[in-house]
Amino acid sequence: NRIPSKAMSTASTRIAIVDGEKCKPSRCGLECKRYCPRVKMGTLCVEVKSTSKISVISEELCIGCGICVKKCPYKAIDIINLPKSLENETTHRFGRNSFKLHRLPTPRPNQVLGLVGTNGIGKSTALKILAGKLKPNLGNFTNPPDWETILKYFRGSELQNYIKRILEEDLVARMKIQYVDQIPRHLRGQVEKLLNARSERDVLKEVCDALELNHLMSRDIDQLSGGELQRLAIAMTTVSKSDVYMYDEPSSYLDVKQRLRAAEVIRSVLDTKKGTYVIVVEHDLAVLDYLSDFVCVLYGRPGAYGVVTMPFNVRDGINIFLAGFVPTE
């Protein structure tokens, strides 16, 4: 195999994305490998056989010609050049030729952090990391770092202390799931019993009144509509006792009036004495403006990579998202 030249090595931030659902080596002519100029020169830039499950592209050896992207009959390949400034800011990568997240949003106590970005850009991934449900591998998916290395990586930032407290269970995180239509698959029983089982704060009555859940108490969860499931999910998260509250798309299925009431309920969990953290992923910009104290924008290419910006005040963050241009990047 040839050793990549110095000119090629400088493009180390180039990423190759292969969609595992679209890539079908057994049904195509392996065009990605056949037409690759690097492979023709004797370099293993693309490794794939008709018996392979998926094509594997070396990002270090790829020259970014884009021939494989054009030749793939299933449109399963994407080659993307990233700024070199992101080279050492990888927070997590799910595997070779898969989605990559750069940086993390930094929550602040007693404030609502809003996350805004298109679908598939890494918002839910960031939430899972901040909730302690996903261990960030800093881009090293073959030999993931230990927590000591991860904490050292975030040394000097507010995230170091936050992640350390999550690890030590000094902070307890609760997350409202994104896809509320899946709730009946995992939970059974009446609405009242489910809420009572999760009620750890003396706010159940107020939350049910605000979210208009009182008339649903005797219903089974599999009888609820999408909007009713959404309000129930918000309520179950809000009435629980936690240090970090996370709401993933709380406005979906709700009308305008219900969205504003849900926003008021979410802001009600802030506790200045305790130093509560609240993080919200929201696509409704009006609700995001009403709900948040500061905003982080996520940009990139859906399904390929996502980058978290520095925090902005709400107005600037929303304007940056709408303009599609980040002045600080």
Please state what every model-predicted region is.
Residues G29-T51, V56, I67-K84:
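Iron-sulfur cluster-binding cysteine motifs and their immediate structural context
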Residues V116-T118:
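The feature captures the beta-strand-to-loop junction immediately N-terminal to the Walker
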